[in-house]
Curated annotation (Swiss-Prot):
Name of the protein described by the UniProt record: Small ribosomal subunit protein uS8
Keyword Ribosomal protein: yes
Cellular-component GO terms for this entry: ribonucleoprotein complex; ribosome
Protein family membership: Belongs to the universal ribosomal protein uS8 family.
Keyword Iron carried by entry: no
Quaternary assembly: Part of the 30S ribosomal subunit. Contacts proteins S5 and S12.
Chain's role: One of the primary rRNA binding proteins, it binds directly to 16S rRNA central domain where it helps coordinate assembly of the platform of the 30S subunit.
Keywords: Ribonucleoprotein, Ribosomal protein, RNA-binding, rRNA-binding
Alphabetized GO MF terms: rRNA binding; structural constituent of ribosome
């Protein structure tokens, strides 16, 4: 099966596992996905992720609040293969007035909207997470 949008597939797998209160989710591995997951972990949206040596799949540990409430309320893919969305540093949108995070692919790697604005770099707006 050929996957046309692997990032959307990863976000959908996370969203579905999150809605069903699963603790872990498996996604096919790639360098871009590992960068995105590193940002999600740093921002506190996921607990952890790791890539076993013998496997080609990333294991993502999802994060929940003490009362089993989901930490990730929503995920939305913005830039798609059929319609790419680019923004300059000044045009990068705030998600829910700063309560969410926009993932931006820049020349400095995958950054959050706040980091991209601070670094004064624009790029492709990959997704919104809140």
């Amino acid at each position: 099966m050929v996957m046309t949008d692997p990032i959307a597939d990863m976000l959908t797998r996370i969203r579905n596992a999150n809605q069903m209160s699963h603790l872990k989710v498996l996604v096919p591995a790639s360098k871009l996905k590992l960068e995105i997951l590193a940002v999600l972990k740093k921002e506190g949206f996921i607990k952890d992720f790791y890539l076993p040596q013998s496997s080609r799949e990333i294991i993502i540990s999802l994060k929940y609040a003490p009362n089993k409430e989901r930490v990730i309320k929503g995920l939305k893919r913005v830039s798609k293969p059929g319609l790419r969305v680019y923004a300059s540093a000044e045009q990068i949108p705030k998600v829910l007035n700063g309560l969410g995070v926009a993932l931006v692919s820049t020349s400095k790697g995958i950054l959050t909207d706040a980091q991209a604005r601070l670094s004064q770099v624009g790029g492709e707006v990959l997704a919104y997470i809140w």
